[in-house]
Amino acid sequence: TDLHSNIHHNQMGELNQWIEHAKKTVDFWPVAYYPFYMKRTETGAGLEDLYDREQIEQDWEQLREAVKQQNEAGYPMFMGYEWQGSGDDGDHNVFFLDNEQPMLHPMRYEELYQAYKDRSAIAIPHHVAYQLGSRGKNWETHREAFSPFAEIYSSHGCSENDTGPFDMERHLHMGPRTGETCYERGLEKGYLVGMIASGDNHNVPAVHDHGTMCV
């Protein structure tokens, strides 16, 4: 499957088309709703912020109903969303085993863990090798059972280490790629953490150029 397909607020009208595409290309689909939009600071720089809460809650309920319908029809889908928090712990996609969970937006990873630790949820870090504080993975706050694997290759490039051939220069405001936060650093700290590749393309699921997850 493609474990990182972000659908935005302004794309929710295309949700049924995305689902039909997923059904043709992947065996199951964990969809990751993207509750952010790009706004401009006073200096003109781009900065991501959450949409209005009412908007994203409406989208969440629309997604919940669509996932429920597909599951009842026999196609396995799972609800999820992208969590960024303050940016100090890295971006994670949160996925749920059941279809009844709320979408929460705490600022720190530990708060996210505490909110979901008694629910059937996982939080998968991605583009982990961006610098610490700029949405790269903070291995000091990592919870192994909550985040059992990491996305190390996607449209952002390769996060396995900071010397590999696939750089991470697509989003300079999140860079540069560093050894401090890369996947290998997590292994060196003794974590048992698997690896996957995913799209992170923000258009449709299973764009295979950026890799997929084998289950």
PLM features per residue range, with description:
Residues 1-215:
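Extended, charged catalytic domains and RNA/DNA-binding interfaces, predominantly
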